């Protein structure tokens, strides 16, 4: 997890953050440019404080405090993990070969949509990250617009974000590990579920807070509504991603944002009662009534 232990008392950890906009140039001449959504992303509750259920703070900090809220109340009322106001990097242009992706107009939304092969895009992204030589103590966020990934075939769509880690040689024979996020800012109406604006990025931010290296093992768990094991990783967003009302509204001035609801730590740990906010197993409290079942 990111930050200090809430059991050790109040402390504030602030993580330097970068946004790297990506413009995807498709073979039909259309460009979908994440640069156009940088301002909206920076103004969102991912970076700006709002009146959350655990205090006036950013989204990632709010859900982290909610996971350990009984401990926070007792031992660390001023415990926080915050993202810095992000440094915005120059836009990186990526030309998508016709065999690796395409752009079209959504039939319901009327929005321009790009679909890209996930293996190809992941390779491009890792090469870009390796070339930036970023401090491994920072969090780079690669931002696209209305561009989603498919696995092998466009019918196997859509990945709208992921977080991962990339190892590289460090000084003196050491090894650096850069964690990073890619997410796509999506227009209203593209998805039938409540996925728009920063939903994808909020999902990945919450998961990065809890499991930045994607190796934080927990007992295997099923997604709600299924008995099949889905994962044994602490992926707080994946646990709720099949709910139609997976996001909630946060008003920032006159603009509405839709960050995702997430599962809290006690759900994965099978704790009863939950040490989460108000004894909950999810941040908003309405989706998970009890700990994760065995599978």
Predicted features along the sequence, with ranges:
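N-terminal carbohydrate-binding/catalytic regions of secreted carbohydrate-active enzymes
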Residues: 1-97
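A general marker of short, structured functional hotspots
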Residues: 22, 43-46, 55, 65, ...
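Short non-domain terminal segments
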Residues: 24, 45-48, 102, 160, ...
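Long, folded non-catalytic interaction modules
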Residues: 35, 99-112
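Active-site-proximal segment of zinc-dependent metalloprotease catalytic domains
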Residues: 106-216
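Metalloprotease/metallohydrolase-associated module, dominated by Zn2+-dependent proteases
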Residues: 154-191, 195, 212-295
């Amino acid at each position: 997890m990111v930050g200090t232990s809430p059991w050790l008392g109040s402390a504030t950890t602030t993580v330097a953050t970068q946004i790297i906009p990506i413009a995807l140039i498709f073979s039909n001449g259309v460009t979908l440019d994440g640069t156009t959504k940088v301002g909206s992303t920076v103004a969102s509750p991912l970076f700006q404080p709002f009146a959350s259920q655990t205090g006036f703070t950013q989204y990632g900090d709010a859900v982290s405090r909610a996971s350990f809220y009984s401990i926070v109340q007792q031992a660390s009322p001023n415990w926080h993990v915050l993202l810095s106001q992000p440094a915005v990097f120059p836009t990186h242009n990526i030309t998508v070969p016709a065999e690796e992706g395409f752009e079209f107009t959504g039939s319901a939304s009327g929005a321009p949509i790009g679909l890209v092969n996930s293996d190809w895009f992941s390779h491009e992204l890792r090469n870009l990250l390796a070339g930036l030589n970023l401090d491994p103590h920072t969090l780079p966020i690669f931002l696209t617009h209305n561009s989603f990934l498919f696995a092998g075939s466009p019918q196997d769509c859509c990945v709208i974000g992921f977080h991962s880690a990339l190892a590289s040689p460090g000084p003196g024979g050491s090894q650096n590990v850069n964690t990073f996020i890619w997410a796509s800012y999506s227009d209203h109406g593209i998805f039938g579920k409540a996925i728009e604006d920063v939903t994808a990025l909020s999902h990945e931010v919450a998961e990065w807070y809890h499991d930045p290296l994607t190796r934080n093992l927990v007992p295997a768990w099923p997604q709600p509504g299924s008995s099949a094991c889905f994962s044994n990783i602490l992926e707080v967003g994946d646990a709720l991603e099949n709910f139609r009302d997976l996001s909630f509204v946060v008003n920032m001035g006159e603009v509405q944002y839709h960050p995702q609801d997430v599962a809290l730590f006690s759900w994965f740990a099978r704790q009863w009662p939950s040490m989460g906010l108000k004894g909950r197993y999810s941040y908003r409290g309405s989706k998970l009534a009890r700990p994760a079942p065995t599978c």
